[in-house]
Amino acid sequence: MRTVSINVSNLCIPCYNRCRYCLLSWDGKTIGVDYPRSEAYARKFYNWLQENRPELNFAFYFGYSMEHPHLLESIDFLREIGSPGGEFLQFDGMKFRKDEEIRELLLNLKARGIKLIDLTFYGTEAYHDQFAARPGDFDYLLRILRIANEVNLDVNAGLALNHENAGQAGELLEQLQRYRLSRVFAFVPHGEGRGENLEPVRFRQSDYDGLPASVKGIFNRQKFRPEGQWVRERRFSTW
């Protein structure tokens, strides 16, 4: 095994969603240290790697959301150390804002060097809001998407597929295609963290078979395969 990168993550920022498959197992309580302390630690780690292991990639992340009280200043630090968050932000779970507040935030982010934001959709409106455990979240993401288009900030949109929402994927994609997207893709949520909650509704081969061609076209079949196919091809680690 070869080490190629080192990541430091601090779960110190609350998220306004409670999604059923949260990788970080967000349960309403932050577990990280205070942000200034974590930034100082990340800086020391980065400086050490630059002097001793410059061939290793390094990234610093904070979560559970990007609702950082000093987000713009933190972006400066992320860009300074070459962390992806200096140019790209996952925009799920942000607090509700009025349109003019969204516009101001996005313009400030652009001015700070952010080039791309990412939004995740869990189905059409009613199902999405239930899945994210926040009424109004679907409409809020569409407002963010619309205003991002207006200020010329690139947006990626991910469609999280499971057994319950597979039948909504075509309608959802049609709705999203009314906007300008840098990339739109469908994926199967992971099983880590609170993703264990999705096991009863895990996406199945029959769900894939029923998808419209438009959705199949944005689904990475090489990455997301039935378990039986992975076993037959022996594309898994030996423990």
Language-model regions: role of each:
Residues 10-14, 37-44, 69:
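SEC14/CRAL-TRIO lipid-binding/transfer domains and related phosphoinositide-recognition modules
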Residues 25, 31-33, 39, 122, ...:
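Radical SAM enzyme [4Fe-4S]-AdoMet core and its adjacent flexible, acidic
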Residues 42-46, 72-76, 102-107, 142-145, ...:
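Generic structural signal for well-ordered alpha-helices
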Residues 98-99, 108, 221:
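Polar helix-capping/helix-linker motif
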